[in-house]
Swiss-Prot record:
RI-alpha binding site, predicted to form an amphipathic helix, could participate in protein-protein interactions with a complementary surface on the R-subunit dimer. Residues 279-337, 482-695 are annotated as: Disordered. This is A-kinase anchor protein 17A. The gene coding for this protein is located in the pseudoautosomal region 1 (PAR1) of X and Y chromosomes. GO terms for molecular function: protein kinase A binding; RNA binding. One of its GO terms (cellular component) is cytosol. Residues 83-112 are annotated as: PKA-RI and PKA-RII subunit binding domain. Widely expressed. Found in heart, brain, lung, liver, skeletal muscle, kidney and pancreas. Expressed in activated B-cells and placenta. Expressed in all cell lines tested including Jurkat-TAg, U-937 and HEK293 cells. There is a cross-link at K118 (Glycyl lysine isopeptide (Lys-Gly) (interchain with G-Cter in SUMO1)). Residues 425-454 are annotated as: PKA-RI-alpha subunit binding domain.
Amino acid sequence: MAAATIVHDTSEAVELCPAYGLYLKPITKMTISVALPQLKQPGKSISNWEVMERLKGMVQNHQFSTLRISKSTMDFIRFEGEVENKSLVKSFLACLDGKTIKLSGFSDILKVRAAEFKIDFPTRHDWDSFFRDAKDMNETLPGERPDTIHLEGLPCKWFALKESGSEKPSEDVLVKVFEKFGEIRNVDIPMLDPYREEMTGRNFHTFSFGGHLNFEAYVQYREYMGFIQAMSALRGMKLMYKGEDGKAVACNIKVSFDSTKHLSDASIKKRQLERQKLQELEQQREEQKRREKEAEERQRAEERKQKELEELERERKREEKLRKREQKQRDRELRRNQKKLEKLQAEEQKQLQEKIKLEERKLLLAQRNLQSIRLIAELLSRAKAVKLREQEQKEEKLRLQQQEERRRLQEAELRRVEEEKERALGLQRKERELRERLLSILLSKKPDDSHTHDELGVAHADLLQPVLDILQTVSSGCVSATTLHPLGGQPPAGAPKESPAHPEADGAPKSVNGSVAEEAPCKEVQSSCRVVPEDGSPEKRCPGGVLSCIPDNNQQPKGIPACEQNVSRKDTRSEQDKCNREPSKGRGRATGDGLADRHKRERSRARRASSREDGRPRKERRPHKKHAYKDDSPRRRSTSPDHTRSRRSHSKDRHRRERSRERRGSASRKHSRHRRRSERSRSRSPSRHRSTWNR
């Protein structure tokens, strides 16, 4: 029978037995035939699935519950469709009957015919004519007249007792369900009789992989009216089961009248006799089994007795051979123990071998891991070495670039020093010309009388005072520079750590350019020029001192390497400005204002030199603070008693003002000036000293 289907609309269901959830639902089937065209092209076919989808598309408002193909030929395809309600059958027929379908790839149209499904159910005329025409039927006897219904395809689970937990159908449930139509005389479910298969030689139940799902049953009514009502109620119906959760399931059942006299008295007696025979046969088989079992037991008892006799005989023999058997037993135990020991030793040896293999495997894995780690470490070290090599190459490239840049700077510095040297030589030439001019001026004058000599001496002293100031400034800077060690180098081993406070007290030191020794004669000449004795003339005192104070520019420095001639550009320019500015200003200004301006310029140069220091520690500069040089700049000009009164008073007032200003600021200015001068002299190179003396 067909499988159960889900029912969504249960409005047309009729109650059969609500206690067990059984209802009757009308069968709403229809047959649909689609005429196929003649296939003219070979290899071309019509898809049944496409035709089915076109039929479903023709009914837009509703859907088929089921639509399946019942028959398919070259001329037509027949479908069986089922809908939810009986009322929908006519609307479906109106949508399908007489319509056409156009398939893709075919020029011909397909005509559709639809009609209501004809139910195969026996009518009253069928069973009346059957029982009337049958010769072996007696309508006066139950079972041989139309009073028995034959049901097929009933689900076992729907007719099983709920409290029993079994899925086998129950005759009591079957009676309660079908006694609605009338009093039931007898029922029969063949699958419940274990002897029925042996009696009839056929199977009365439907088999499936899930077990006994469906069964057949016979229901016999006492009255003919009960049979008529049952057949009328089951016509065109299918059985529906509604569970406790409200879900409904329906299945088709086959209903017919019994034409085999299954529940007639003769058939029942016949089945009972056959059952009795089968039971007797079964009893005989059981009796035969019991007798065979008893015979086997007797045989076993006799065998036991025989064995006992034999055992007694063996016991006698055993007593005779007890000593041998004991010996054999001991030997056997010894061999058994030996075998067990050998077996245990073999097992232990096997376990030991397995452990050794396992340890070797672990060792091999550890070695592989170690090799992997070493390989990774080697690869990483190589990668690191490559990285370091690349970094070193970059650093080497950068260093070469820096060296190239430094070389270019040094070349530029050398070019600048050469230019400075050329300029210094030019200045030396100018200085030599000036000296020659001064010498010619001094030598061209002849002394006439003492008064004229005094006037000329005063005039010459006034004229040469700026030149003497310049020479004293240059000589004092050179003396302070010679007391310090060279720039960037260490002082000589025999040099004292602290420079003397009074250079004139020491011997004549050897400077870099060899001209520092002339400082003492120069100072003596200055002192002689400042204090004029009564018996000496100015011409005899001043010219010789002036000429002795002028250094010789032809002396060249010895033993100074060319690498120490590099000085900073700003210091060189400041010295050049000093050389360019001081002579002109010294000639034009002999007053105290010019001297103060000169001191200010010296202090500004000392500050610039101290700012350019190379970060020398303060502790290295501290010892130089204790020794301050005396200011060698001239503070007084030599005067003559025969000079004019106005000039003498003017000069005295000017010198008095200068001395008062110098006394007020000498304590602080002298210490800072000498410290800056010593630091500036340390920062200068020997080439700087040489260029200063050359200027």
